[in-house]
């Protein structure tokens, strides 16, 4: 997207002008720094908050039912009763109280018997991905990932000069046969594969879930080839109907690093997540985390712990699941009403996203400008793959938007998509 294609904030314009001006300090950047880039999600953030636009772009949780009064009371109580501790340095692993709470949350997901001594509190699960890349990957190493996968993880791995190799999915998630084939191909080429990064439950961006019968098979394949599994599960507790699907980590404590987050089940603003790390890997993982942040925010840790202890968070999550189920249903119905017959889309059973596929030959990145003109924002599919090739796919987020806005956003987007499909068919 160029500055001519949309209005830029003054801050963004200044940054672009600064980037255009050559400076002698440019020569000081490391090779790694040249691999750092802003995600497509952040690219459209300033645009998506413009008045009048319906944003189906950002995967933000709904906070409308969060009891802000209780959050305020909890924060006040933490400051009044434990202020000196809350405003001071803490341990690099995170507080024991929060790590114990995290183990209770993971037990609800199906990870039983996890020890707080194996948990590292991180600055969101994004930080856990960064630590994993730092600890395990050398430049040129390979990380396997679902195709498509989370754009933030792609940016993290690429910043460490890691080669991300996509593995295909179908409606039941990562395909084990394709995983085996990709591993064999890369090993035959002499590549070193360190990690499989996977979002098995309600994948971002596709909303697809790895079938229960495939989960152990995927871990077994990785174990056979000495590949660690990095399981990112921020949406695991947000299955619309029924209990969460058992994480890969549950039966594989030595082969899976499990990443969780409070961003989707409580608040992204507290910037707290965690990694459950195999015992034999824990020390180096923890030290790498400590080297960057020294310690997670004591105030935020104590706020989250105290809030969850004084609040029925299980009931709150049940209500949240109902909210997301309603919003997902609104989006699916609107897509059926306003999108052309040539378009297909996923039908998620949880999470935040629907993944739309248009006919081959349609490039959804140029469509973004037309969608903005029509009053709606989405994320083009090319953002979710390491390839720079055009993509006929796009991600729509229903999580942070009320049903009536979802319907209006899809209604606005429908003619844009229909025109692109018709032009492609000529």
Question: Across the structure, where does each feature detected by a protein language model lie?
Answer:
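Conserved core segment of the aminotransferase class I/II
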Residues: 254-322
């Amino acid at each position: 997207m160029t500055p001519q294609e949309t209005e830029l904030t003054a801050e963004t314009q200044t940054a672009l002008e600064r980037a255009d001006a050559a400076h002698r300090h440019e020569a000081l950047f490391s090779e790694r720094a040249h691999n750092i880039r802003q995600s497509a999600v952040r690219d459209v953030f300033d645009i998506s908050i413009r008045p009048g636009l319906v944003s189906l772009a950002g995967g933000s949780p709904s906070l409308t039912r969060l009891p802000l009064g209780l959050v305020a009371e909890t924060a006040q109580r933490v400051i009044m009763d434990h202020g000196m501790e809350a405003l001071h340095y803490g341990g690099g692993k995170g507080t024991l109280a929060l790590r114990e709470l995290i183990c209770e949350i993971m037990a609800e997901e199906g990870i039983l018997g996890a020890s707080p001594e194996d948990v590292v509190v991180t600055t969101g699960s994004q930080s856990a991905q960064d630590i994993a890349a730092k600890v395990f990957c050398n430049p040129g190493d390979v990380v396997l990932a679902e195709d498509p996968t989370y754009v933030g993880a792609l940016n993290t791995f690429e910043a460490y000069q890691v080669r991300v190799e996509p593995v295909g999915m179908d409606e039941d998630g990562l395909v084990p046969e394709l995983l085996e084939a990709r591993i064999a191909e890369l090993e035959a080429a002499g590549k070193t594969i360190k990690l499989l990064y996977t979002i098995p439950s309600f994948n971002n961006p596709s909303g697809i879930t790895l079938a229960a019968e495939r989960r152990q098979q995927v871990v077994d394949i990785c174990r056979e080839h000495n590949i660690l599994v990095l399981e990112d599960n921020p949406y695991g507790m947000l299955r619309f109907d029924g209990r969460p699907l058992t994480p890969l980590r549950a039966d594989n404590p030595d082969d899976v690093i499990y990443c969780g987050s409070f961003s989707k089940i409580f608040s992204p603003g507290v910037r707290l997540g965690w990694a459950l790390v195999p015992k034999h890997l824990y020390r180096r993982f923890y030290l790498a985390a400590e080297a960057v942040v020294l310690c997670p925010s004591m105030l935020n840790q104590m706020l989250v712990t105290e809030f969850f202890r004084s609040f029925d968070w299980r009931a709150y999550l049940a209500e949240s699941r109902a909210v997301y189920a309603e919003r997902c249903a609104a989006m699916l119905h609107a897509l059926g009403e306003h999108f052309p017959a040539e378009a297909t889309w996923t039908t998620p059973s949880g999470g935040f996203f629907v993944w739309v596929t248009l006919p081959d030959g349609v490039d959804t990145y140029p469509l973004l400008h037309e969608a903005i003109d029509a009053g709606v924002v989405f994320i083009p599919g090319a953002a979710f793959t390491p390839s720079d090739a055009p993509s006929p796919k796009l991600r729509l987020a229903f999580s942070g938007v009320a049903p009536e806005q979802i319907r209006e956003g899809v209604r606005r987007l429908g003619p844009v998509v229909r025109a692109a499909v018709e032009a492609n068919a000529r």
